[in-house]
Each structure stands twice: as structure tokens, then as C-alpha cells.
């Protein structure tokens, strides 16, 4: 049954027999699609594929967890890694939607973007903002941020997106692009409490 196979896959992994572990995990996925181990097994498969740059296979494994929804304890990390799998395939728009999904999930948990949470939470959120900045800088900068949120709806953390994008450009010494990022936010949100700070940059 699935528990026997699951234990077998763990045993193989612990002694470094990764290929055998993968073969067993693939059996679990095919033969026991309702297994209670499915999300963990799919996450381990996703990590295997991702580290070997098999991003399409990784995407498929992570997506199967995301499709389960927040009921899975692997949901958030799978959503994040799904974003990266798409990003590595240069599917920037699809990747952005997944990374924004990570931030949306954080909103539902009551995460405070100003104060942050635990070190692990803050690191993942910071990394998510960083890769979102990379994605928007690859696809046209602040105007693509405007387009994205016009299409997908406003978010409470939009200010962080613009701020991180501006900071990303500053690090690259792209000063005009940095200024455009801050000014675009101010233009769209003139009454936001951060707007005066952005206006001075």
C-alpha cells in the first residue's frame, strides 16, 4: 500500500539511493492519487526535478500541490517553487501570478508586511518581492506593474512591489528607472501615507 511505498522511498533517500526513491514516489503518485502522503511526495519530486533543471517536470509536481489548496501544509512553499519553475522557463507573466499568490496567501494569514513575521517568513516574503522585481524589470518595469494590477486587481502590498522594484533599479544604478518606479506609485496613489517619501526620492 501507499504507506509501505512511502516508507520505502524514505529509506532509499536516507541511504542516498535517490533514483530508486524517485521511482517509488512516482508509483505512489500514479497508483495512489488520494494518498495522505501525496503532497509531501510531490514536493520531494518537485525538488528533485528543480535541482536538476527539469523545470517542466518540477512545475507539474509543484502545481499538483497548489491545486490541493491551503489545506496542504506544503501549499505556500509549493506555490513559491512553482513560481520559480515558471520563471526559470522565462514564463514571467505566469511566474508573477504565482509569486503574487504567495503574497496573497500571506495576507489571508494576517501577515504584517511592515513588521514582518518570523525570520523564515520574512525571508520568504523578501525573496518573493525580490523575484517579483526581477520579473517586472525583465518585462518592462513600472508600467508592467500598473498593467498587472489593473488586470488582476489592487493589492494591499502594492507599495512594497513598487518600492522593491525601485530599490532593485537603484542597486543596478538605473536611476531613471528607479525614479520612474517611485513616481508611478505616487501618481496612482497620491494620498498613500508613503507617497511623500517616494516623492522625495
Where do the PLM segments sit?
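Acidic, polar-rich low-complexity tracts and alpha-helical solenoid repeat scaffolds
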Residues: 1-201
